[in-house]
Every structure is written in C-alpha cells, then in structure tokens.
Amino acid sequence: MTKKDKKQKVKVKTVETKEGEKIRVFEDLDSFETYLRGETEDEEFDHVHCQVRYYPPFVLHESHQDPEKIKESANSHNKKFVRHLHQHVEKHLLKDIKDSLGVPELKFKDKSKEENFNHVVWRYHAPTAVRDREFLVHVTVECHNDTAMVDVDYLTEPMQPAVQSEQVA
C-alpha cells in the first residue's frame, strides 16, 4: 500500500449509545486528526463526539513499531510512562487538535488530573469560536494499569447563549 493510499483510508466505526448519541470511534490518531480537519470544513465542528484508542508514538518508538514488543511495564503504574504520556498530550495531541480545528490560539486553561490505582485521567476544557460559532472543546485522556493503550475522548458542544432576564419596569 502506498503512502497516498494510507492517508485516504480513514479507520472509523460509528457507535450509538443508549441515549441515541452517535460516537465515532477511530483506530488510530491520524484518522482522528483527518476527521477533525474534515469536520471543520463541513460545518459540523461544534457538535462532535469521537474517541480514539491508540499506542502513543513514544511507546511504539521504544518497541520499534511492533505492538507485540511493548513492555508490560508501559502502563499507568510506571512514572516514566505517565510523564512521557503527559508530555505527548500537552505538546503534541492538544497542539494537533488546535491545528486540526484551525484555531492556533486555542488555550486549554481548564485542566484537571485524576489518579487512582486503575488509571490516570487528564481532562482539558476550552471555549473557542470558529466562523462566529462559539463552542466548548472537552478532551479526556486516560491510561490504564494493564496496557499502554491510551483512550482519548473528544467532545464539542455549542455554547448556550446567556439567558437575559427581562426586567419589569
């Protein structure tokens, strides 16, 4: 398969939740980023929910691009793995999301981290506007104690206009 063919193939499944919400689930990070770029062009960028589950690039690099050779210690219990994952998220994933949306000034100021025995979760939230449409971007990144796979949940919601209270004169 040529490089051109790989770029054209978007690996995605659409899953419907019990509430009727449709979530797009991607098999790799490149397909996810390609989809975000396409949604920005298609005017559907302010109401998107998708997920991607992938091995971080630094993990694949250490295993020479072979998922079978990934060390069992590459998980949320390993401080080095968690540190590298956080750097990957801050310096690459969030930056790629900004670029895909076409909003380089997007700042994820509302951040939180939750850590327990089973997983580590980072949550990022940021309000933004594209083509005069305001919306909130929510990104949740989760790593688990039993695998090097990372789960990313990406959600955008239109901002509700402020309800103005009517004053009675």
From Swiss-Prot:
Species this protein is from: Eremothecium gossypii (strain ATCC 10895 / CBS 109.51 / FGSC 9923 / NRRL Y-1056) (Yeast)
GO cellular component entries: plasma membrane
Gene3D superfamilies according to UniProt: Respiratory growth induced protein 1
Main function: Involved in the control of energetic metabolism and significantly contribute to cell fitness, especially under respiratory growth conditions.
Residue ranges that the Swiss-Prot or TrEMBL entry lists as coiled coil: none
UniProt membrane topology term: Peripheral membrane protein
Keywords noted in UniProt: Cell membrane, Membrane
UniProt xrefs under Pfam families: RGI1 (PF10843)
GO biological process, one term: energy reserve metabolic process
Subcellular location as annotated: Cell membrane
Protein name per the record: Respiratory growth induced protein 1
Entry's family note: Belongs to the RGI1 family.
